Amino acid sequence: MPVVDISAAEIGIYSLSGDTKNPTPNIEFNLNSFRDPLGNLHLRRTCVDGKDPAVQEWIKVDPRFEPILNQCIILAKDATQGGTKWFSIGFRDHHGTWISRAVATLISNELATLGFKVGVLHAKGQD
């Protein structure tokens, strides 16, 4: 199933910056400990934000990514099998432009591949 418009989703995925107040997700992951793509000169020069596939591939190597993905799959299954009509997961990092957008995009694509009706909202980053 492809990622859908956020208004048609049963699971909302949000990328958030340090100062984003809304939306407020049901569950939020703090990604500040992830390695920062801005530290990679090639990515910084060739990519615009975390929605770029090169940034996403770089983020997937971080040892924190796979456990978060697995936890999100469990949360999505629990929410939808429990009859919840709406459930949201947020990913926050300082800038909200690189790490959180990459993780939100990767997680939403994986959940959609598993058949969940997922929508993504990328909040305005600080960059």
Locations of regions flagged by a protein language model:
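Catalytic cysteine-centered active loop of the rhodanese-like fold, especially the PTP/DSP P-loop
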Residues: 82-110
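Short coil/turn segments at beta-strand junctions that form active-site/ligand-binding loops
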Residues: 26, 83-87, 116
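Glycine-rich, flexible N-terminal cofactor/catalytic loop recognition
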Residues: 2-50
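Post-Walker A helix-loop "phosphate-sensing" segment adjacent to the P-loop in P-loop NTPases
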Residues: 108-118
